[in-house]
């Protein structure tokens, strides 16, 4: 396990030095903290007899869904450096398995072997040479491809105004949906006071209310006159010889 972790640490160290944002002491401090974190994490999830077991748990991943790897971030915090100063690409995946460390650098690039080990007797110089050769190859062959993939990623995230439908959707008021507007009814024209004079004197009774006035939302029914009873004014007696004013009829 120590060789595989050493390969991962060498890989990150070379990337950080290429970015040239941190001093040598800060890079060494980061490498030491990352080594301790990975050893503590992998010690109970390392299966030489079945290397693929626990592969997802040991994976170090940076992409648009996980922009910061938690183990690398913890190493930065423990070594008092900023994560952004590492200069990591936007798409990076490292598979740390027994006897082999693989990497995919960039979004559309193929995975490659960073280092493979047949035994545990290899020294750090040999591991460093393997990692350096692999990293030099990937940065020279895939650097332009990873940059274009990062640009494609930013373009995918950006929302283009032309892709959005510009046709306005109909807007309805809540009152229109719940309470439909009632039809307009024209009021009866007002009559002058002189029109209700009968028998030489002004009537004290209002004009008759039109019966069977249509109501909104209902079908018109057949006209049925409402029975009325004539109520004589106080002090006036009714007999058959008197003329009855129709405006003096009042609903019963």
Curated annotation (Swiss-Prot):
Database matches in InterPro entries: Anti_prolifrtn, BTG, BTG-like_sf
Top-rank lineage group of the source organism = Eukaryota
Cite a single Pfam family from the UniProt record: BTG
- Where is the region Disordered? 138-162
What are its GO biological-process terms? negative regulation of cell population proliferation; negative regulation of mitotic cell cycle; response to oxidative stress
Its induction note reads: By 12-O-tetradecanoylphorbol-13-acetate (TPA). Induced at higher levels by TPA and cycloheximide together. Also induced by redox changes after stimulation by hydrogen peroxide or menadione.
Q: Name one GO cellular component term.
A: cytoplasm
Q: Which SMART domains match?
A: btg1 (SM00099)
Q: In which tissues is it expressed?
A: Highly expressed in the brain.
Question: What is this protein's function per UniProt?
Answer: Overexpression impairs serum-induced cell cycle progression from the G0/G1 to S phase.
**Family per record:** Belongs to the BTG family.
Protein name per its UniProtKB record: Protein BTG3
Species in which this protein is naturally found: Rattus norvegicus (Rat)
């Amino acid at each position: 396990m120590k060789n595989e972790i050493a390969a991962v640490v060498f890989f990150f160290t070379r990337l950080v030095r290429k970015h040239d944002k941190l001093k040598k002491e800060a890079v060494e401090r980061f490498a030491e903290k990352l080594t301790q974190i990975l050893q503590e994490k992998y010690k109970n999830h390392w299966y030489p007899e079945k290397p693929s077991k626990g592969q997802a748990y040991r994976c170090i991943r940076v992409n648009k869904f996980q922009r910061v790897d938690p183990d690398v971030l913890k190493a930065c915090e423990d070594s008092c450096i900023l994560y952004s100063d590492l200069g990591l690409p936007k798409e990076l995946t490292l598979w740390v398995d027994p006897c082999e460390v693989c990497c995919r650098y960039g979004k559309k690039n193929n995975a490659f072997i960073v280092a493979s080990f047949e035994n545990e007797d290899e020294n750090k110089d040999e591991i460093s040479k393997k990692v350096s050769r692999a990293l030099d190859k990937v940065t020279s062959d895939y650097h332009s491809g990873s940059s274009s993939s990062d640009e494609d990623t930013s373009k995918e995230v950006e929302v283009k105004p032309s892709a959005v439908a510009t046709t306005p959707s109909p807007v309805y008021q809540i009152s229109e949906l719940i309470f439909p507007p009632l039809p307009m009814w024209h009021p009866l024209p007002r009559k002058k006071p002189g029109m209700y004079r009968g028998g030489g004197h002004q009537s004290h009774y209002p004009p008759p209310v039109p019966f069977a006035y249509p109501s909104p939302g209902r079908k018109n029914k057949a006209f049925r006159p409402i029975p009325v009873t004539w109520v004589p004014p106080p002090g006036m007696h009714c007999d058959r010889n008197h003329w009855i004013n129709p405006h003096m009829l009042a609903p019963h």
